[in-house]
Each structure stands twice: as C-alpha cells, then as structure tokens.
C-alpha cells in the first residue's frame, strides 16, 4: 500500500473561521490507501511551551465545546481504514502529538474527506430547517 501527498487548503479555511490563528498553522494532507480517508500533518507554533499531554487535553476540552462530531481526539492505535465513515471532521491521533524546540507542535489529524463533509452538510440542513 502507498500513500501520497494531496493538495489541501483545509488549514487556510480554518484560518478564515479562526482568524486569530492566521500565520500560526501549516499543514500537509496525505492521501492514504483507503478510498476516502486522509491524514493531515499539522504544524502549529505556540506562544508558550506545553507538553504533548497538555496539548491533547486542551484539544479534548475544545472538542467538548464544539458542536458534536467536529473534533475528536483518539488515544487508540488505529490505522487509516479505521477512520472510514467517521463522522468527525477532524480526529487528532494523540499518540502522534510531538513537541519540538521553540514551541513547535506537530499533530497528525485524520479525516474522512467525503463522509465527514456530508455529515456537516446534514448539520447545516438541520440548522436551516429549524430557523
């Protein structure tokens, strides 16, 4: 099985939604040997130091504040195929969180590009139907 890099501007779209992160994100998407699942190698520059455990916990806490299935953090040792038909827009693999010198953090984020997107469109449709 092979994987290849994929063109993605997901992190740029995140900057539009979260403008205070502008200039702090850089990412590379990777197509993995499944039909729909991709992985994003996300690099973030922090203003202050933190451990990988603190970062993962902050992400878990943030996931609780967001609408359901937008963000997840997985502590399980999973493979790309395990994320097929996962409704979450992004799942951080906590086992791969790394902290480098100068407060540089690397995250591995999995997402089912088709299924999660379809789920968010359903969320929007439900929201609009209640207005």
Regions found by a protein language model. Give the residues of each.
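Residue-level preference for beta-strand/loop junctions
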Residues: 3, 36-38
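Short, conserved catalytic or adaptor-binding loops enriched in Gly and charged residues
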Residues: 17-20, 98
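Glycine-rich phosphate/diphosphate-binding loop of Rossmann-like nucleotide-binding domains
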Residues: 14
């Amino acid at each position: 099985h092979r994987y290849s890099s994929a063109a993605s501007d997901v992190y740029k779209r995140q900057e539009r939604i979260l403008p205070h992160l502008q200039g702090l994100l850089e990412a590379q998407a990777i197509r993995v040997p499944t039909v729909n699942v991709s992985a994003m190698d996300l690099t973030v520059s922090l203003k202050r130091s933190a451990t990988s455990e603190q970062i993962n916990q902050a992400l878990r806490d943030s996931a609780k504040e967001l609408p359901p299935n937008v963000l997840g953090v997985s502590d399980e040792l999973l493979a790309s195929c395990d994320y097929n038909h996962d409704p979450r827009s992004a799942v951080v693999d906590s086992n791969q969180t790394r902290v480098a010198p100068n407060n540089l953090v690397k995250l591995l984020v999995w997402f089912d590009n088709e299924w999660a997107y379809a789920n968010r469109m359903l969320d929007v449709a439900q929201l609009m139907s209640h207005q």
